[in-house]
Every structure is written in C-alpha cells, then in structure tokens.
C-alpha cells in the first residue's frame, strides 16, 4: 500500500486527485506476458501493428511481474501451474489487475478434469473476464476498455485490490458454459414412430 493510500481515511473526499491518478493509471496499463495455451497466440496477435494496442497505452508487455500492472491469464491453468500464477500475482506492485482471457482461464473450458483449475479466480481475484475460445484481439481490446472504465471509478481512499467486480457476472458466464457443455453430452432418445391407423403390426 502506498503512502498516499495510508494517509487518508475513507471519509475523505479526493475527487480531483482521483481523476488525475485514474487518468494516469488507465492510460498506461502495462500487461505481463503470461501465455499458457492457445489464447496466448491471440494475445501476441493483438500486440502487432495491425491492431495497434498502443491506442490503449498497453503496448509495453513486461516480462517481469515487478514492472507490470495487468496480468493477462491466457490459457489453461493446471493445478501444478496454479501456485506459480499465485506467486507471480503476489510479486506485482499495487495497483494491479487480473484479466482472465478465454474460457479455459475463466471456467476451465472443456477440460473439466482433476488436473485443471476450474477458473483462475479460485486463486487470484479477477477483474475482467474475456469470453471466447480463443478470444479474438477485438475481444481483448474490449476487455481493456472495460478495465479502463473500472479504473476510472477507483479512489485513493481504497486499495485497488479491494474493489472487485460483482460475482454475478462470473456466475452467469459459468452457467452459460455449463449449459453449453451439458448440451453437447445430452443423449437424445429416438422419437417413437407415429401411430398410423391400419399399419400397426401385432
């Protein structure tokens, strides 16, 4: 926690200072290169000149957690990789944010097994969920815009990690994924043949 956040109490109004700090934070979110599976290919594609991620101030991908603000978890998180993800998150300085990119990072994707973590939010707090399998670069940019909107509403009187998204968004996303997964495994019983008078066999 920084000196400024320690100095003021929660009932102290910092509207003008909040505006300046939030503007600086949202305009220079530095993501960390943390690709785990196929979603990382789309994350790398988003950093090319065709998509121009510099518009959002996120063109500086940092290889070190100590120099980054945003951890984009792109891909499947296995149980062996989970402690590494948690440790890297703890090494990031405040303020820090987490984006779950793709179905695997959000809810485990199609890998509903004992070896796969069913959502990275079980080990680190997630701010934005980017849907898709894998998500296109446009989806990643939409997630960055949502993160910038969230940063706009932060205040120095509260630690950034204390302000998290409502869990209803994740619950709705998980429910839709489970319905889609259950729909692919439903056994459809053959329909009974129609009864036509005079054609019944004994």
UniProtKB/Swiss-Prot annotation:
InterPro entries: NADH_UbQ_OxRdtase-like_20kDa, NADH_UQ_OxRdtase_20Kd_su
HAMAP family: NDH1_NuoB
Top-level taxon of origin: Bacteria
Keyword terms: 4Fe-4S, Cell inner membrane, Cell membrane, Iron, Iron-sulfur, Membrane, Metal-binding, NAD, Quinone, Translocase, Transport, Ubiquinone
Membrane topology: Peripheral membrane protein
GO cellular component terms, semicolon-separated: plasma membrane; respiratory chain complex I
Listed GO biological process terms: aerobic respiration; electron transport coupled proton transport
Cofactor descriptive note: Binds 1 [4Fe-4S] cluster.
Residues reported in the UniProt entry to bind [4Fe-4S] cluster: 38-39, 104, 133
Identification of the protein by name: NADH-quinone oxidoreductase subunit B 2
């Amino acid at each position: 926690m920084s000196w400024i956040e320690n100095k003021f109490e929660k009932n102290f109004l910092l509207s003008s200072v909040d505006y300046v700090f939030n503007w600086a934070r949202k305009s220079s979110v530095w993501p960390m290169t943390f690709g785990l599976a196929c979603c990382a290919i789309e994350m790398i594609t988003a950093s090319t000149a065709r998509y121009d991620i510099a518009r959002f101030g996120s063109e500086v991908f940092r290889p070190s957690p100590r120099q980054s603000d945003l951890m984009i978890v792109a891909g499947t998180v296995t149980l062996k990789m989970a402690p590494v993800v948690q440790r890297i998150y703890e090494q990031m300085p405040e303020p820090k944010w987490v984006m779950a990119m793709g179905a695997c990072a959000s809810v485990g994707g199609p890998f509903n097994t004992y070896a796969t973590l069913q959502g990275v939010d079980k080990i680190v707090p997630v701010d934005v969920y980017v849907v898709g399998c894998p998500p296109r670069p446009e989806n990643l940019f939409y997630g960055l815009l949502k993160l910038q909107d969230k940063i706009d509403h932060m205040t120095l009187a509260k630690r950034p990690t204390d302000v998290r998204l409502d869990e209803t968004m994740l619950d709705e996303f998980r429910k839709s994924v489970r319905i889609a997964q259950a729909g692919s495994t439903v056994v459809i019983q053959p329909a009974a043949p129609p009864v036509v008078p005079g054609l019944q066999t004994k």
